[in-house]
Amino acid sequence: MSWQAYVDDHLMCDIEGHEGHRLTAAAIVGHDGSVWAQSATFPQFKPEEMNGIMTDFNEPGHLAPTGLHLGGTKYMVIQGEAGAVIRGKKGSGGITIKKTGQAVVCGIYEEPVTPGQCNMVVERLGDYLIEQGL
């Protein structure tokens, strides 16, 4: 399966039990900041934004004072899982980022999608990739 198929079929799909509800944007990005695959709607990000995200995985709390920035959008960092998941909130939407062995899986959402639904979609794929050694 191509990386693009993972984004299209596992991240940008309808959320279970909620036909028509899906993430706004999603991507799989290597730890080095290279985009493996992304939805057409995923924001163009700056290298320093991805560097900040990777630093927060290695030093949990790094982004808390400044917020998480991606594609010029600032998200308030909320409870995640140290070294594994970063979650951010902006208005009625937000972002979930799950770290795997070689990449990060990113999902961005807006209402009516809930934070929990975004977490489920992103973390499920991230856990699968970890199981596959990726």
From Swiss-Prot:
Keywords: Actin-binding, Allergen, Cytoplasm, Cytoskeleton, Disulfide bond, Phosphoprotein
Phosphothreonine: modified positions: 114
GO MF term set: actin monomer binding
Processing and modification events after translation: Phosphorylated by MAP kinases.
Subcellular localization: Cytoplasm, Cytoskeleton
Keyword field contains Nuclease: no
Disulfide bonds listed in the record: 13-118
InterPro entries: PFN, PFN_euk, PFN_sf, Profilin_CS
Keyword hit for Transferase: no
SUPFAM superfamilies: Profilin (actin-binding protein)
An annotated GO cellular component: cell cortex
Motif (Involved in PIP2 interaction): 84-100
Extra facts: The variability of the residues taking part of IgE-binding epitopes might be responsible of the difference in cross-reactivity among olive pollen cultivars, and between distantly related pollen species, leading to a variable range of allergy reactions among atopic patients.
Function description: Binds to actin and affects the structure of the cytoskeleton. At high concentrations, profilin prevents the polymerization of actin, whereas it enhances it at low concentrations.
Subunit (UniProt): Occurs in many kinds of cells as a complex with monomeric actin in a 1:1 ratio.
Family: Belongs to the profilin family.
The name this protein goes by in its record: Profilin-2
